[in-house]
Amino acid sequence: MAEAPLHFPETECQRLEPHLPPPQSPETSPPSPSTLPFVTLTFATSLDSALALGPGIRTALSGPQSKAMTHYLRTRHDAICVGVGTAIADDPGLNSRLATTAAADVAHHTDGSSKDKNSSGDAITTHQPRPIIIDPHLRWDFTAESKVMRLAREGRGLAPYIVTLRQDLPTHKRRLLASLGGKFILLDAEHATGRFDWRAILSAVRQEGLHSVMIEGGGEVINSLLGENASLVDSVIVTIAPVWLGKGGVTVSPPRTRGADRPVARLSDTTWVPLGDDVVLCGRIAR
């Protein structure tokens, strides 16, 4: 049974607008000279900077209003990206359930248009983001019944592009992806350093015609971006939930160079948006 669509007020959409990628319309937008997409880093955290109670433990932090905001953000990006750990732990759908009233007139995108109705006749968003899974060593053992695949099959989302270093791609996995419109994206072996080569990943995403990507996690992905790759991030949108998860959680704490006498990264041009019991912090990485 289809999940109920979410609603996000137009007034709140406008407060977020300065921190979002410019709308893309193939009919009116000139080709972008950039080799990288617009990157929004977004996640929900506790008051003690934790994403989850522990590795592999799915932990709900966002309230209903900020959850609806996340689905609105998905309509404003061409792609949504998570790491393999999140794909394994959460079996995410990586789609948007936003009702069209909140987003239909806001943005035009390069692909991913779809529309569905629930049992009450509510129209669901006209745009779906392309899921991007970063899985260098093909750890994610997806099947036709994985949520993102099922949603793609039902027309309520898109099949993922899986970024990997592995050359020996399983034939049945490749065929399953292709049957739903997804595929593997192979990075060159020179990037097999055991670390995230974000410039290579983002360049590969842009080469697929995707102008913007929101990166949602998990912890290793977020920390690697906020560290030495912070210059690649255009916007940061963080939902802060009024809860402490306690010691042992997966935290946002990017690596700092030994002996460095300044913070790893700092936000500028900040906006605070209260949403229910949560508060959302929007900003840009200070250059």
Model-inferred region functions:
Residues 1-287:
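Enzymes that bind and transform nitrogen-containing heteroaromatic metabolites
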